[in-house]
Amino acid sequence: MLDFNQHSKFHERVTSHIDASLDAERAEQKARTYLGASRLGVECERALQYEYAGAPNDLGRGFSGRILRIFEVGHVMEELAVRWLRMAGFELHNQKPDGGQFGFSAAAGRLQGHVDGIITAAPPELGLSFPMLFECKTMADKHWKACAKSGVAVTKPVYAAQMAT
């Protein structure tokens, strides 16, 4: 029998509105004229060339609303991690005096990147050397466990490249 009263679930309808707004926000962002250093761990050189050239994504192959939500959660978690580290006695600088991120550029500006922060001091009993870069990564529990077991380089090679850049 056909059910003409079937509707998507409430949370799915709300999420579709959120995703559409995130898609619209992303569409308004100015396109990069450089290759982001966070992409250096991507193995497919052709994909990197297309990205650098500004080729459009294949239909349905861009960042979905779900992925954009995950990115936003990562930014919020980064803010919390910075706060917690500072509370624990770390001197962590995550913005320049003008408010922008610390960044770098190579290859006449064709390659650019940013760091999440720079740590210049920590509790002495940790025995750390300074300065050191701070890179904050978030991931689902199953990915975290895989990284703990096999290492970031094996489990998340793109993350490993980002942290090493």
Q: Where are the model-predicted features located?
A:
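Residue-level detection of beta-strand scaffold positions
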Residues: 133-134, 163
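Membrane-associated lipid acylation/remodeling enzymes share a hydrophobic transmembrane-juxtamembrane segment
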Residues: 155-165
